[in-house]
Amino acid sequence: MFTCINCTKMADRGEEDEEDEARGSTTPNTKEAVKSLTTQIKDMASKFSGSHKQSKPTPGSSSSNLRKFPDFDTASESVPYPYPGGSTSSTPAWDLPRSSYHQSGRPDSRFTSMYGGERESISAQSCDVVLEDDEPKEWMAQVEPGVHITFVSLPSGGNDLKRIRFSREVFDKWQAQRWWGENYDRIVELYNVQRFNRQALQTPGRSEDQSQRDSTYTRIDSARESRDWTQRDNNFRPPGGSVPHHFYGPPMDAARITTSSRDEPPSMSNASEMQGEWVEEDEPGVYITIRQLPDGTRELRRVRFSRERFGEVHAKTWWEQNRDRIQTQYL
């Protein structure tokens, strides 16, 4: 009999479908594979990011560690370099507070270096100590009421006499010249004067303006050129307080003394407002500045250590060991 054409076509399609299924069972689907691979990569990435978050430091931990030692951190942040005067030949000056010494029950030792104002300070209990370079330092002494002398401390020891001022309320021109003539030798010996500052010696004549309060009286010739000059002991220490009002030494020629009135208005440089201050060498490399107050008491103004003999730690140790002795001996 004849075969149906439609049936033949359907049979052919069935065979083709069977062949496709056979191929599909042996070859993986490309989309399925890509999707599976993408899922695996995402899983790995999520695991990696999770472990990274666990090892990440907590916020603020680093900043808290930086401030674990606040004293050290503060000191390190406040140290400008290098030391005063641009010289490293000496250790930093100890400025002492303007008050009488009081014992403190707790030690408070703190080193702070300041260079460029240039100063290194140490504070021990109730006083601050500064280590300074061995450069010349000016200081003023009230020899007696109305007489103030400005000195410059010399690195090699002794003092340079820079200026003498007399109060107009106590001295006129001739009284001042007479006083200087009578007291010159005593001043040289008392304050261990090694030389005079010649720049301050020649001054103009006296002005008649009464608003000018003080005069400067200086010697014209250097003391080293004087026949009467003798080298003084570098270890001589001027005593504290006022010295006797009259001292009759060899008179000086009035022509060797000149006077001048200062042009500036009255200020703290006026003799009636000044306070006596002097420097004593306690031991080699240790210089102590003492001030005489108007009520007769003394205060410790400054302790200086030479860098050639003292480092910071050595200076601090020395001050802690000798503080009580210094207060008792000089105040």
UniProtKB/Swiss-Prot annotation:
- After gene disruption, what is the outcome? No visible phenotype.
**Per the record, which residues fall in region Disordered?**
1-111, 201-246, 258-279
Name a single GO cellular component: nucleus
Q: What else is known?
A: Overexpression of BRXL1 can rescue the short root phenotype. However, it does not act redundantly with BRX in vivo, presumably due to a much lower level of expression.
Listed PANTHER family: PROTEIN BREVIS RADIX-LIKE 1 (PTHR46058:SF26)
- Return the Polar residues bias intervals: 25-41, 48-66
Any idea what this protein is called?
A: Protein Brevis radix-like 1
Return the similarity comment.
Belongs to the BRX family.
Which sequence ranges form a coiled-coil region, renumbered to this chain? none
Recite the UniProt keywords alphabetically.
Nucleus, Repeat
- Return the InterPro entries for the record: Brevis_radix_dom, BRX-like, BRX_N
Q: What does this protein do?
A: May act as a regulator of cell proliferation and elongation in the root.
